[in-house]
Amino acid sequence: MTQVAEIKSPHEQRLEDNIAGKEDIYRESHKRVFKLLERFDGQKPAIDVERALYFTQSMAETVGQPLVLRWAKALMNVAKNITVMVQDDQLLLGRCGGHDGRYGILYPELDGDFLDIAVRDLPTRPQSPASISPEDAKIVVEQIAPFWKGRTYHEALNKALPAEVHKLTYDDPDGLISRFIVNETSSFRSSIQWVHDYEVVLKRGFNGLKQEMEEKLAALDPASPVDQVDKRPFIEATILVCDAIVLWAKRHADAARKAAEACADPVRKAELIRMAENAEHVPANPARDFYEAVQSQYFTQMFSRLEQKTGTTISNGRMDQYFYPFYKKDMEAGILTDEKTLEYLECMWVGMAEFIDMYISPAGGAFNEGYAHWEAVTIGGQTPDGRDATNDLTYLFLKSKREFPLHYPDLAARIHSRAPERYLWDVAETIKFGSGFPKLCNDEECIPLYVSKGATFEEALDYAVSGCIEIRMPNRDTYTSGGAYTNFASAVEMALYDGKMKKYGDVQLGIQTGDARKFKSWDEFWNAYVQQHMLLLRTTFIQQYIVIQTRAKHFAQPMGSVLHALCRKHCIDLHQPQIPEGLNFGYFEFMGLGTVIDSLAAIKKLVFEDKKLTMDQLIDALEANFEGYEDIQQLLRTAPCYGNDDEYADEIGRELDRMAVSFAAKYGKEMGINNDARYVPFTSHVPFGKVVSATPNGRVAWFPLADGSSPSHGADHNGPTAILLSNHNTKNYGMRARAARLINVKFTPKCVEGDAGTEKLVQFIRTWCDLKLWHIQFNVINADTLKKAQKDPQKYRNLIVRIAGYSAYFVDLTPDLQNDLIARTGHDQM
């Protein structure tokens, strides 16, 4: 019998060709950036300590001064002293230190109490390891860490949490070990994801912003306590930070001129001179052409990383919109080509990929495997006046993702009901390529929801995707506190074991709801679960309220603030809890939705309705982790499951969502924010699963939870459209205290083969859009390719896969997360 060859995605075929020694078909047209990429291919990132050192030196000298002014002075010290370098072949300037290749920087003000642990463990830890030289390690231990002992945000938060909240947050008195039940994320990022108003930099430059703030300074009332005590330090800080980034750029210009003087190659010499000219003009002044616009944005993006650890780095916003006027003008003038446009952009992509968003705490590393960072570029969508926004640049971004094999930056495509067929076709073709780009965000859900929460239509229509799959409205969003990740699968376990969890022995973590073996009805078990569920919600919101109050005393953001119209208008730092006219859109994560739905459905259906097993039999099987009880495990897997358009399971999911959203609506309002229910795990469904023992859906102990709002692994039997319908069925559309929902779908390349496959995928996307679901992302890959990469990681070094709102190199992931990806259902029919 003739064996049929396996259909491969273009990404898989490209890897196989490279393994076979064939020349990459795109190398010649992307020669420069391929050379840049090869310099750090497979390289473990290095820790660069310069930012932490110069930041710490300044902060030690300014103790007692207003925090926002101290922050600006520290940034000026960094700008003056940090190494500036010009990389061979690069066309852009702007690095956050002196390391060539992949590197990350430290933020001791955030989690400096972890520094000693980090220096010891980072090089060898399984999640996102990083190297550090002995000399730099000594600087960290002797010159940086001592100042921050007792001064870090993490230490302050650890002390501020009430005992009952602390117990569900941390597993040790010092807060160095996470419990993975109600996890705070604010101690490994000084704010959640963010998007700057890059357009104001391109149009006015930092000198223009500085002039605005100087005028505000001159207008202050000398007799006003508010003006002199609150506003003056803020204004002085914003002026200083404008000077700092301009100085930093000028130092890069000097370095480029020096490199040009020493360069014998006339072509490279001319490039270096032009790079110097760019850096002398931007970001101080408005950009005059496309190249300057790219350089100005890149300086702004990179200097933001020196300011503080913002979420998963600062997102890039709607690049195809704010770059388009420069692109159009230069194309019409005949001074720019599409090839050169891609070269400039891809030089930026490489620079962003080289910078690693370093998480030094063990919990931070577990949450963000594969060196996760999201500088999401948003394309498509609508203009502020409601017209389709796609343009020629939109298609160039998609082309770049198909041709240039790099996992950064992330690419997010906005979709709306009137999206052009050409755009949807190009999006589908890019998804089919197989590297996980782009993720999709739905205008039909996001825009009406944000208008209902207080945004104008113009503001909501202009949203940008930020972070994993959140959205931001530049100049209107003002909320920055890191959210909580709440493990609702632990509520199932605590309902089964009278408020205890196997992982934590006899510690009474939850409410004593009784011996579940003695429950005689579904109502009894449901009542026990609801009590544990509500305990987790209460803990989440108390924790987050303390986070909000504590952060304002430890963080300031003068650069982020000067780029925000409301901060400039009201002379208030972005980290303050309330900014006049701002909209505070925060969130907490509902972790393990599919696991919880399926577990509750199994108990309700099999134990109390069909009586196919008793609570004693169920708990005996769970306590044995199904060893010797494989028949019960298989029976549990026959129960109704989320992800199959099954009304029985979906009704339970809708009630779980209703409880979470109702709580958020009531107590978020009391806190003065929108602290809404969100279903986006990053990679945390893996470590959260490691604390949850066997669950009634047949999942074995310590196995990953269901991720985001996706089904449990192997539980989706009715095809991908049923996943969409279950997601729709479990949402409470009439309630507005809801936020993002992440959906992962895995197709085999055979499923989307050829033009017919592209058309099927386009129609699938239209169905998703019509259902008003927030997000969806795809892996188009064969499971065999992933298994081969596990066995021979060096050969598959460049295999890119979709994780949770971002793509990463498969071989950079831990075996647990690799296995999690392999276990996702690969649909071969649509």
Swiss-Prot record:
Transmembrane segments: none annotated. One of its GO terms (molecular function) is lyase activity. It catalyses: 2-hydroxyethane-1-sulfonate = acetaldehyde + sulfite + H(+). The keyword Lyase applies. It is an enzyme of class 4 (lyase). Its EC number is 4.4.1.38. Requires the activating protein IslB to generate the key active site glycyl radical on Gly-805 that is involved in catalysis. GO terms for biological process: alkanesulfonate catabolic process. Induction: Highly up-regulated in the presence of taurine or isethionate. The active site is at C468 (cysteine radical intermediate), E470 (proton acceptor). Pathway: Organosulfur degradation; alkanesulfonate degradation. 2-hydroxyethane-1-sulfonate binds at R189, Q193, C468, I469, E470, R678. Taurine is an abundant dietary and host-derived molecule whose metabolism to hydrogen sulfide (H2S) by members of the human gut microbiota has many prominent connections to host health and disease. The human gut bacterium and opportunistic pathogen Bilophila wadsworthia produces H2S when respiring sulfite (HSO3-) released from organosulfonate substrates such as taurine and isethionate. Belongs to the glycyl radical enzyme (GRE) family. Homodimer. Involved in an anaerobic respiration pathway that converts the sulfonate taurine (2-aminoethanesulfonate) to ammonia, acetate and sulfide. Catalyzes the radical-mediated C-S bond cleavage of isethionate (2-hydroxyethanesulfonate) to form sulfite and acetaldehyde. Is not able to use any alternate organosulfonate or (S)-1,2-propanediol or choline as a substrate, showing that this enzyme is highly specific for isethionate. This is Isethionate sulfite-lyase.
